[in-house]
């Protein structure tokens, strides 16, 4: 069975969504995955104005009519995808975030690929609420980014360099393992990034002894080397200093990274140092981000 055998791509018929679908096409083509295109029809009051809604006798009529229309649109949307990919379409009615998470669970999806609502110079303020909820609740990895509308045609998407940003928490092993396997699949270079915040190397405006800084770097390097051995993964270790989201984005920009892989918290949200910055990393990253 393929590593990513089932991929779920929510479709909202927007340019950003189309870009996300192109990444999903590339992955499904490479891994010979089943690609499910999911469109969620929100409750009627979210679709119609107060003047339009009374024209329908019941909410059932509204939902059924809308669902049939969306099914036709989604089928047409699917026809434009890569002919080599096995595509299944599904239209459901309900809360978008809830339905995306539930569909992923029921289908045993290995990956969700979806766009955020952020774009342009204001993207850091605009991580969509649906994306945020999916990131919080989904059990499988989520592939997203605020700039996916800029994605090239699926045939021109390449993965030459992968950055795996870890904080050495317990979940870092799974994150590095996923990033390493993805890098091997595409014969890509792997950078393993750890960020030491400035608060760890300065206190009250005074920097610690440079020898202590060097000791901290060595401790981190040894921890990463142990993870590499445990996961049978190897990459170039990059230890940065500063604000984690900005440092990770800086590495991704300077090294022309094609994908950033990070961890996110479990059972109640995002936790830990790097994981606490997961949303900020998503907003700042110049390339797509997979959260594990």
List PLM regions with ranges.
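Small/aliphatic-rich secondary-structure junction motif
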Residues: 2-57, 157-206, 210, 232, ...
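Proline-centered helix-kink/hinge sites
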Residues: 10, 96, 139-141, 165, ...
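A short acidic, glycine-rich active-site loop
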Residues: 56-70, 209-219
């Amino acid at each position: 069975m393929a590593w990513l055998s089932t991929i779920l791509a929510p479709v909202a018929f927007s340019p950003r969504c189309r870009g996300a679908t192109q990444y999903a096409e590339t992955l499904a083509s490479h891994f010979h995955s089943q690609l499910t295109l999911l469109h969620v029809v929100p409750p009627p009051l979210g679709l119609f104005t107060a003047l339009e809604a009374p024209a329908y006798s019941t909410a059932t009529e509204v939902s059924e009519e809308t669902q049939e229309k969306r099914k036709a649109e989604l089928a047409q949307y699917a026809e434009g995808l890569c002919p080599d990919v096995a595509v299944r379409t599904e239209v459901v009615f309900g809360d978008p975030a809830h339905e995306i998470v539930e569909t992923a669970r029921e289908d045993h999806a290995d990956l969700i690929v979806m766009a955020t609502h952020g774009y342009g110079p204001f993207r850091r303020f605009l991580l969509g609420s649906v994306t945020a909820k999916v990131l919080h609740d989904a059990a499988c990895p989520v592939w997203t980014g605020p700039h996916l509308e800029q994605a090239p045609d699926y045939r021109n998407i390449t993965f030459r360099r992968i950055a795996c940003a870890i904080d050495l928490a317990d979940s870092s092993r799974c994150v590095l393992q996923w990033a390493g396997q993805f890098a091997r699949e595409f014969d890509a270079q792997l950078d393993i990034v750890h960020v030491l915040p400035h608060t760890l190397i300065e206190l009250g405006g005074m920097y610690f002894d440079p020898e202590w800084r060097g000791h901290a770097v060595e401790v981190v390097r040894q921890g990463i080397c142990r993870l590499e051995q445990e996961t049978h993964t190897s990459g170039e270790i990059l230890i940065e200093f500063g604000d984690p989201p900005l440092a990770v984005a800086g590495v991704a920009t300077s090294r022309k990274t094609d994908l950033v892989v990070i961890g996110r918290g479990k059972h109640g949200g995002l936790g830990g140092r790097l994981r606490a910055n997961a949303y900020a990393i998503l907003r700042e990253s110049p390339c797509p981000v997979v959260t594990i």
